[in-house]
Amino acid sequence: MVVTGVAGFIGSHLAERLVADGHEVVGIDSFEDYYPRSYKEANLAGLRQARGFSLVEEGLLALSRGRDQGPSRLEELLAGAGCVFHLAAQAGVRASWGQSFRIYTDNNVLGTQVVLEACRRAGVGKVVYASSSSVYGDTDVLPMREDALCLPVSPYGVTKLAAEQLCRLYWKNHGVPTVSLRFFTVYGPRQRPDMAFHLFLRAMHEGRPLEMYGTGNQTRDFTFVDDIVGGIVRAVDGRDGAVYNLGGGSRVTLLEAIRTLERVSGLSAQVHGEAVQAGDVEHTWADLTRAREDLGYTPQVGLEEGLRREAGWYRTLEITPSR
């Protein structure tokens, strides 16, 4: 098994699950400096000691560069893999505007294309691509179904949708067995330091006002990381060329989520309202019918329990948040 983006929030959880299930796992990560390396090192602390895990610290584009003779390093790493879980990406909706867009096209679009091309040449059993609910854009048609028209409202969402289309093209034209998964607002232990609940917990621990964009009445389908990992693993048996939503199974306002976070953490939140940011959507909610019927996917962890676990993890952080 190969996991790209293995040092990240979801990638590290997935690799741990695969190793625990008895698989040999090759993890690939460039340690992109979108957030401090110390967080990623902490994510990998257990895996580095695990039997059956090896790490390749290099970017996908660098690994894909051809040699004078023979396959690229990326092809060698992927050769004969039972599954390539492609989670590597440039994250963040709000940071994807302006000059930063080049980074997103390189990492999310071109990075996916070189993985798919290497998989085509190397002959892998399956490619599971981590997409995002951001591809849907701002819609009042809820819950969101996989066959809906996708009109993303951020450059990040555009790159994730483009990568989905590449997966479909490589399946249709070259027979590469791909599955694309649209993740809905993933949270839990190891959540990236730029993500909402992590930021909220930091502000609450430091006694500062937390910044909430919009009125707080916008809704999200929050999905606990263990449920996402379970869905990713099940996707190995998904229909080739298919797209699946992976959500938490409920729709909650941001204000409700903050009140729940207060309750489970024992801390109070001073909420400071900010203007809605470009690229943000009003509502998300996953239709899980296809994932339930094809994959047997059913989320197990509700928001209160999931936030309790994230709050407990945050209290144990040994990293200096501002590092």
Language model segments and positions:
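Residue-level recognition of oxygen-bearing side chains
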Residues: 73, 83, 110, 192-196, ...
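C-terminal substrate-binding subdomain of Rossmann-fold SDR/epimerase-dehydratase oxidoreductases
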Residues: 14, 23, 204-323
